[in-house]
Swiss-Prot record:
SUPFAM superfamilies: Cysteine proteinases. The lineage of its organism: Eukaryota, Viridiplantae, Streptophyta, Embryophyta, Tracheophyta. SMART domains: Pept_C1 (SM00645). Cysteine proteinase with a high level of diversity in substrate specificity, an amino acid bearing a proline residue at the P2 position is preferred. Belongs to the peptidase C1 family. This is Zingipain-1. PANTHER family: CYSTEINE PROTEASE FAMILY C1-RELATED. PROSITE patterns: THIOL_PROTEASE_ASN (PS00640). Disulfide bonds join 24-65, 58-98, 155-206.
Length: 221
């Protein structure tokens, strides 16, 4: 397969502005929602900010502010028939009761797929088509204090933070992933981090290639 030399889904209008999860451990919801916002824009042309809070409150196979998994968020959206907009089910940053009155199916997806583990080439193929959910180790000081540039600092390969890969490019012969975080716009490069790509470890930098997944949305005939 011929892959584009670089891709940045922000430039293609498939990424809403960076959000902030606050003190709630809901990165899994922000990660899943960013991927759904992306594929919805790619398929329909509409960029709609969707509700992380609905996932926190209603995705019972996840644990709200105590953590969760993007693939289970995708399962919830599929089983629920869709997800509401952020406007109508806004983020509070706390565990709430599922508000069934605010269950408008603003955006739906058809299924989801896991990218083969520990294979940056497969992740590259997936990101060529849409933003992809990944897990990374964000517990380290280097990561938390990241300001700018291509991140080459120390980190483990444990899965403790989810975020969304929105592109891949090369600068001065260094390959990197463009990763959207959910710690607000003041962190990193306006809320993003560039992470070195094609490294020796198959798990990728900070474990980025361990368990990527993405939602699937068919174009309505």
């Amino acid at each position: 397969d011929v892959l584009p030399d670089s891709i940045d889904w922000r430039e293609k209008g498939a990424v809403v502005p960076v959000k902030n999860q606050g003190g709630c451990g809901s990165c899994w919801a922000f990660d899943a929602i960013a991927a759904v916002e992306g594929i919805n824009q790619i398929v329909t042309g509409d960029l709609i900010s969707l509700s992380e809070q609905q996932l926190v409150d209603c995705s019972t196979r996840n644990h709200g502010c105590e953590g969760g998994w993007p693939y289970r968020a995708f399962q919830y959206i599929i089983n629920n028939g869709g997800i509401n907009s952020e406007e109508h089910y806004p983020y509070t940053g706390t565990n709430g009761t599922c508000d069934t009155k605010e269950n408008a199916h603003v955006v739906s997806i058809d299924s989801y797929r896991n990218v083969p583990s520990n294979d940056e080439k497969s992740l590259q193929k997936a990101v060529a088509n849409q933003p992809v959910s990944v897990t990374m180790d964000a517990a380290g000081r280097d990561f938390q204090l990241y300001r700018n540039g291509i991140f080459t600092g120390s980190c483990n390969i444990s899965a403790n933070h989810y975020r969304t890969v929105g592109g891949r490019e090369t600068e001065n012969d260094k390959d990197y992933w463009t990763v959207k975080n959910s710690w607000g716009k003041n962190w990193g490069e306006s809320g993003y981090i560039r992470v070195e790509r094609n490294i020796a470890e198959s798990s990728g930098k900070c474990g980025i290639a361990i368990s990527p997944s993405y939602p699937i949305k068919e174009x309505x005939x």
